[in-house]
Amino acid sequence: KDEVGVYDSYPNANDLFIDFWFKGDYSAIFKYDTENNSYLRSMGYDENDNPIPHADQDTKEQINVKNVIVQYVTESPIPNDPKGRLDYELVGSGTGLVFIDGKVIDVTWNKEARDERTMFYDSDGAEIQFNRGQIWVSVVPDRNIEQVVYN
């Protein structure tokens, strides 16, 4: 989308915390940068409990994206896998959150087949209009919804 203000009626959400495995090295933190209308990503915490900026390997700059999706999915063990790996069900439908323009939108998602695009819809059934630019998708097991916190 190119228009500003499309989602002004939705609640503000400047900070997003996704604490995988109960806070630690794998925690994802997104802070809304009003100046650039983007989200700065950090990963994990330092010894003083401050988020560690997640730097792009090539540019060495902190990762920033225009849209963040939290997609809740069903997680299950892969049968007979000797390493105990997990499967995340990405085909089908579910719920999630979209963070865009400093706002948060409760969404539903639908993906008809493995080679199809995942579609995201607001509570009225309208397709989400994402900002031009990067989209970061955080796939979160639906049993861990309480570990996704925003304000």
Please provide the spans of the model-predicted regions:
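A surface/extracellular/periplasmic glyco- and lipid-processing/surface-interacting theme
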Residues: 1-151
